Structures are given as structure tokens and as C-alpha cells.
Amino acid sequence: MIAKPPTSTYFSVKVSNILPYGGPDSELGASLRYLSQRFAMPLPELKGTLTDIGTEELNHLEMIGAIVYQLTKDLTEDEIKEQGFGDYFVDHTTGIFPQAAAGFPYTAASMQVKGDPITDLHESMAAEQKARTTYDNILRFCDDYDVKDPIRFLRAREVVHYQRFGENLRLLTDKLNEKNFYAFNPSFDKKCFKNELKKKKK
């Protein structure tokens, strides 16, 4: 059984360096992606799902920020030098700045909003899988239970979000009046829905 280490150990500080507060697959990117994609969704159910999950991702962003701050707020100058936190400290002290594990700042270039519900839902599903893999990789490096437990929770939520987006994709395609889902844009081509087809026949 692994003993629970204090949160100021070398190992924990190194983990704080790789937590995805602002990386391409981060909670920040997820929240902006979903809250932006929702506007072009043609069905209220889809708008609701993206709003709910996008809002939840903001809560997850706060969790990651809190973990990083708790791991670094009491570091001494020697610990900062020895534990790989110096570059970050020079720019931000122990403030929480949205950057990737590799150190580059968050950029919206890592997300996409196409305005096509089918495309955007696939984008969202892929984002959840990438976030899950990121958390899997963090868990491989982490022995601090104060970090592992919330990361496991966040990982589990990525799986749930993936499933909900999949359900929404099925809901959308079931309401379309053609089997070739790629022949039109359900957000732009309004008559592609079955109810519109029925109205046209009347």
C-alpha cells in the first residue's frame, strides 16, 4: 500500500506542472467550445445539453485551478528552483494562469465551432475522449490521493459527457428526413427535419 505523501513533495509539485488548466484539451477549452457551439443547435434539447455541460466544465476548471494553487502556494524559493516550477513562477508567481502542460498559453485555435450540429457534436465527443486520455496520463504520474481522487472524478465526468453527446447526435439524426446526414447542414438547411417535410406535404 502506498503511503499518502504530503502535498508539498517534489512529486506533487511536478504534477501541478502538467494539470490541464489551459491546454488544448483543458476544461477551459471545453467550456468555451460547448457554450459557443450551442447557439447553432437547431433543437432545444441540444442547446440544453451543451449549456449544461459547458457550465459544468467551468466548475471543473475551478477544481483544476484549486488543485494547482494548493500544490504550489506554500513553496519555498529552494523548492521552486529544485522542483521545476521556476519558469512558471517568474511569469505568474503562484497565480493560476491558463496554459498547457508544455507551458504555452491557452489559445482558441485549439477548439472549433463549425455551425454544423453534426460536425460540432462529433467535435465535442472527440474533445471528451481527448480529455479522458489526458486524465488517464496524469493518473499514471500521480501518487497523491488528494490529487488522484478529484482527477478520477473529472475523468468519470468526461465519459458521461461523451455518452450524452452521443445520445444528442442520435436524437438529431433521428429527426432528419434523409438518411444521408452529410448532404446538408441541419443548422442552416431548415427543411431537413421530418416535421418540416410533413408541413411541406400539407
What function would you assign to each model-found segment?
Residues 1-202:
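Non-heme di-metal
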